[in-house]
């Protein structure tokens, strides 16, 4: 929510400055700045959020329909795992993810020109979209089980090399090198959490299930590649969780589409129930743990429902934000 609050401040400040002054004062990507400037002239920030949600929802619906998956099931999984933390917190990243989904669809349809076009648009909203290029290029290459260990080993080698180059200062010429160093030092102080280890184990188990599936399809191959790349990042880039946390947003979408299509269509009721319980536990952790600042407004609602005094919600949000910052500094 601290990022979202910054979005709101930038959005509302445009009316007091021209476009070029706004661009110079902001560090966001150019295409997002252009879209923000255009919409700020005609609609309020809340309306802009609504339009972003409608656009993202429509693209997700189209992605589900392409593979014949149920939209409601996919939406439920994404809501528990990623929606509140991306669409409601990092607006430009959510738009970027939607454009990456369009790029993947066009690539699978062998329309390379449109795929490259949507990829360029996604980078214009968030530069991290470049990290999804390997998945895009490999999505039509059949993934064999014999390649898994090799790719995971490559992830470890890449992670160790990246860590060495980062610590040695060889990445200092990169514009966001300070941010990379900040996130890696922050992770080193906090260590690896039990939740992160559980998530790695869960993805490993899901990877095994994907290779046990004998009904080969484009969706299955895409789910295998996205899960494997996420695992390689989790194992190799453990010191930079912000990297694989962003990557998992797309992976969760693809996994949700696969699960919605296969678990429900094939009648895997027990597996579906287990997934539902795990997803609800993940959502409960986000809603109840004060460390997740982006969920403070929803935590306020829960407090009110439980009968406590609602008080000043905005004041409580900034108190939670200050506590979160102090916790990271320590």
What are these regions (language model features)?
Residues 88-94:
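Short acidic/glycine- and proline-prone juxtamembrane loop motifs at membrane-interface regions
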Residues 61-81:
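Transmembrane-helix signature of polytopic, membrane-embedded enzymes
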Residues 100-114:
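Membrane-interface transmembrane helices that cradle and orient dolichyl/undecaprenyl
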Residues 1-3:
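Short, small-residue-biased leader/transition segments that mark boundaries at the very start
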Residues 7-20, 136-252, 290-310:
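Alpha-helical transmembrane segments and terminal signal-anchor/GPI-anchor hydrophobic tails
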Residues 226, 254, 274-330:
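Transmembrane helical bundles and short interhelical boundary loops of multi-pass, membrane-embedded
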Residues 30, 41-58:
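Loop-to-helix entry region of an early transmembrane alpha helix in multi-pass inner-membrane enzymes
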Residues 7-43:
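Short hydrophobic/aromatic helix or loop-helix immediately within or flanking a transmembrane segment
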């Amino acid at each position: 929510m601290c990022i979202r609050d910054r979005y709101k401040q930038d959005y509302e400040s445009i009316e007091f400055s021209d476009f070029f002054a706004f661009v110079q004062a902001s560090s966001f990507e150019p295409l997002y700045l252009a879209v923000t400037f255009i919409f700020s002239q005609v609609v309020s920030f809340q309306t802009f959020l609504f339009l972003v949600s409608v656009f993202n929802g429509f693209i997700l619906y189209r992605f589900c329909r392409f593979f014949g998956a149920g939209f409601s099931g996919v939406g439920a999984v994404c809501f528990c795992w990623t929606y509140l933390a991306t669409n409601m917190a990092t607006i430009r990243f959510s738009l970027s993810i939607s454009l990456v989904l369009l790029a993947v669809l066009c690539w699978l349809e062998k329309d390379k020109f449109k795929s490259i076009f949507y990829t360029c648009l996604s980078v214009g909203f968030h530069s991290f979209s470049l990290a999804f290029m390997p998945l895009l290029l490999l999505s039509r290459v059949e993934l064999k089980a014999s390649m898994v260990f090799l790719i995971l080993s490559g992830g470890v080698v890449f992670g160790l090399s990246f860590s060495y180059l980062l610590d040695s200062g060889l990445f200092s010429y990169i514009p966001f090198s300070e941010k990379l160093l900040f996130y890696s030092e922050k992770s080193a102080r906090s260590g690896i959490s039990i939740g992160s280890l559980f998530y790695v184990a869960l993805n490993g188990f899901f990877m095994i299930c994907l290779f046990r599936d004998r009904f080969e399809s484009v969706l299955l191959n895409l789910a295998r590649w996205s899960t494997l790349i996420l695992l390689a990042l989790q194992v190799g880039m453990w010191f930079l969780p912000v990297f694989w946390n962003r990557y998992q947003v797309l992976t969760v979408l693809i996994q949700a589409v696969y699960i919605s299509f296969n678990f429900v269509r094939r009648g895997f009721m027990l597996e579906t129930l287990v997934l539902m319980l795990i997803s609800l536990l993940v959502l409960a952790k986000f809603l109840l743990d004060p460390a997740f600042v982006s969920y403070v407004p929803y935590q306020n609602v829960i407090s009110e429902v439980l009968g406590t005094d609602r008080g000043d919600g905005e004041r409580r949000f900034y108190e939670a934000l200050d506590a979160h910052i102090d916790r990271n500094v320590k």
